[in-house]
Amino acid sequence: MSAATDIRPLIGLAATRPLTGTEAEAAFGALFEGAATPAQIGGLLMAMRVRGETVEEMAAATRAMRARMNRIKAPEGAMDIVGTGGDGKGTLNISTATAFVVAGAGVPVAKHGNRNLSSKSGSADALTHLGLNVMSTPEIAEAALAATGICFMMAPVHHPAMRHVGPARAELGTRTIFNLLGPMTNPGLVKRQLTGTFDRVWNRPMAETLRELGSECAWLVHGGDGTDEISIAEPTWVAQLKDGEITEFQISPEDAGLPVHPFEAILGGDPARNAAALRALLDGAQGAYRDAVVLNAAAALLIAGQAADLREGAEIARTSIDSGKARAKLAALAAQVGAPADPNG
């Protein structure tokens, strides 16, 4: 895609009908090459949002983004545990804690994340307060994954082309297709995902997009309490991609042998508070936060093929925590990536 490409005709098309895959890949290629003005970027993103993004558009945009990202080599069977963000719920860092629990159970986790979007403290914010340098290079992330079975990949480090669209996104201040693309642009190109969505209407379209992109097994989930993860308070809607087939169903904490907790019990705070809660969880603290993480880890272990059902997955997750293996993964990752330049983020 030439940097001189004029995307204005594509903006006009996007406002009236879905773009074809070729058109969408051209449009997003222009965005990522810096060939569009902020007004043009905003026009394209909002035209698509108002009309509703299609699977073909999401797959094409993901391909354009993947083609320009700084990749790492991930081992066979590696997975990502991530949410779209944008649920506005301000919970504790559930997917981050889940990543350490799943890694402690022996599944390689290549976690892709960023700073706060829907919570008061995003995964990167909490990890920084836990003493990890989240801005480590792709080479360090790859080495950490190989050595410890877990890594954290900061989105801006691995997606430098996003610098061209970041200011326009910030000015828009609303959800765009990029909230959907983030979980599908893992730099390790993992083929197994537990992905939370900010609205359950996106569960199936995102599952269809991941199928188009070659994922082997994925759960797209949205909690009944509005969270972009599996809820410990309400039933959760799931779109499962497995062996090329997509099925939709609901699950509840009871399916994993876990109690239901009030949503308020998993509300988070600032990065320091959330980091302290995560460390306490890995040290064996009981309660709603632990149960929420065990529930999400149970699903991740099922997706990874390490558990036959949610109850078995929950048992494996508890063992990962209580044996100290999950906590050891945090320590091992910290040793690999070093401390942040500014521990206060």
Swiss-Prot record:
InterPro entries: Anthranilate_Pribosyl_Tfrase, Glycosyl_Trfase_fam3, Glycosyl_Trfase_fam3_N_dom, Glycosyl_Trfase_fam3_N_dom_sf, Nuc_phospho_transferase. Its cofactor is Mg(2+). It is an enzyme of class 2 (transferase). Anthranilate 1 binds at G83, N114. GO terms for cellular component: cytosol. Mg(2+) 1 binds at S95, E229. Its EC number is 2.4.2.18. The keyword Glycoprotein does not apply. GO terms for biological process: L-tryptophan biosynthetic process. It catalyses: N-(5-phospho-beta-D-ribosyl)anthranilate + diphosphate = 5-phospho-alpha-D-ribose 1-diphosphate + anthranilate. Anthranilate 2 binds at R169. Keywords: Amino-acid biosynthesis, Aromatic amino acid biosynthesis, Glycosyltransferase, Magnesium, Metal-binding, Transferase, Tryptophan biosynthesis. Pathway: Amino-acid biosynthesis; L-tryptophan biosynthesis; L-tryptophan from chorismate: step 2/5. Binds 2 magnesium ions per monomer. Homodimer. PANTHER family: ANTHRANILATE PHOSPHORIBOSYLTRANSFERASE (PTHR43285:SF2). Belongs to the anthranilate phosphoribosyltransferase family. This is Anthranilate phosphoribosyltransferase. The lineage of its organism: Bacteria, Pseudomonadati, Pseudomonadota, Alphaproteobacteria, Rhodobacterales.
